[in-house]
Regions:
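A short helix->loop->beta-strand "cap" motif at the edges of active sites that frequently abuts
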Residues: 145-149
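Oxyanion-hole/transition-state-stabilizing segment in secreted/luminal serine hydrolases
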Residues: 68-84, 93-131, 135, 151, ...
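Catalytic His-Asp segment of secreted/periplasmic serine-dependent ester chemistry enzymes
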Residues: 13, 159-238
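N-terminal secretory targeting modules
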Residues: 1-62, 72, 76-77, 143, ...
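Generic structural signal for well-ordered alpha-helices
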Residues: 100, 134-139, 172, 176
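N-terminal cationic-hydrophobic initiation segments that often serve targeting/anchoring roles
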Residues: 104, 138, 142, 179-180
Length: 238
């Protein structure tokens, strides 16, 4: 006489047969991949370049968005000061925070020139949020490198983002105040000479009316180099 399939003995045998298969299925499941950070590929390229040719310690580190990344002549412009460019285009102030321990502190720079804000405002972030991210950047960097000087550049005007200029001005006001009250930080106004009658000077920009041309970078070179060599009106606090 056939035993019913639902008898205790049959059910027990089925359980013993299926249990190893379930274990194999669980073991074969791939681990969940960590979420990839924005700009991870750009940062990895810098890290690979550093392995082949490590930047000098004590150099001036330029970090920030495309206004830094596209400053391809910065090493020549800052000479004889050694300069390292680690800009990554499209970045916001919050993005730089993700990579402090990879493209900032490992270089042990003597000073840092920092530029963000353009893309933050374009994405809808508020001046106070930018100021807070810059403050966090300063705190994290100086916790690792207490002697480093940090020069925060003003948010620049541009014809393509003229509507954001009032917010940029408010951001610059907050950044200036942050520098005044923070040890080892200086604010550098690169925006003033880029204006004429309150509007961005179009002759300083590429056809996209956002990124600067050589004439625009010539202004930045003169102002930033003066600050780095101690000839600026607002010096970093010792």
């Amino acid at each position: 006489m056939n035993k019913p399939l639902h008898s205790p003995r049959v059910l027990c045998l089925l359980f013993l047969v299926l249990l190893p298969a379930q274990g194999r299925t669980a073991e074969a499941a791939p681990p969940a991949e960590a979420k990839k950070l924005p700009f991870e590929d750009e940062i990895k390229r810098y890290e690979e370049a550093d392995k082949k040719s490590p930047p000098p310690k004590g150099a001036v580190l330029f970090v920030g968005s495309s206004s830094i990344r596209m400053w391809r002549s910065v090493a020549a412009d800052m000479a004889p000061l050694p300069a390292v460019n680690r800009g990554f285009g499209g970045s916001k102030a919050s993005d730089v925070l993700n990579f402090i321990d990879r493209i900032v502190t490992p270089y042990e720079p003597g000073s840092i020139v920092y530029y963000e804000g353009d893309n933050d405002l374009q994405s809808g972030r508020k001046p106070e949020q930018i100021r807070d991210d810059v403050k966090t950047f300063v705190e994290k960097v100086r916790a690792a490198l207490p002697q480093v000087k940090i020069y925060v550049l003003s948010v620049k005007p541009s014809p393509s983002r003229a509507r954001l200029w009032p917010s940029a001005q408010e951001t610059n006001k907050l950044l200036r105040e942050l520098a005044k009250e923070t040890k080892g930080v200086a604010y550098i106004d690169v925006a003033g000479e880029m204006l004429k009658d309150g509007q961005a000077r179009s002759e300083l920009f590429l056809k996209d009316n956002l990124h600067m041309n050589a004439e625009g970078y010539a202004i930045w070179t003169r102002i930033v180099k003066a600050a780095l060599t101690g000839n600026e009106p607002e010096k970093a606090k010792q």
